[in-house]
Amino acid sequence: MANEFRVCDDCDATNLKTLLPRLKSVDPDAKIEIGCQSYCGPGRKKAFAFVNNRPLSAPTEDELLEKVQKKVK
C-alpha cells in the first residue's frame, strides 16, 4: 500500500511551497491530498501533516520531516 500525505492549504504554520517538495522527496510515489484537515488548533502554531491517517506536528518543518520519515512505509 502506498503512503498518503494530507496537508492543509489554509493553516498559518504550514508552508506548502516548501513542505510539498520535501514530502515528495521522502516518497515520490505517495498520494498527496491538499485541503482542510480539521486540525486548525495545532495548525495555527505548528507545522503538521497527516501521514497514513496519523497526525504529526512539530514546531518546525525540519522537525516535522524527521517524524514523517519515521512513519512512512
Curated annotation (Swiss-Prot):
Family: Belongs to the UPF0741 family.
Family matches, as Pfam families: DUF1450
Protein name in the entry: UPF0741 protein BPUM_3395
Lineage of source species: Bacteria, Bacillati, Bacillota, Bacilli, Bacillales
Recorded superkingdom: Bacteria
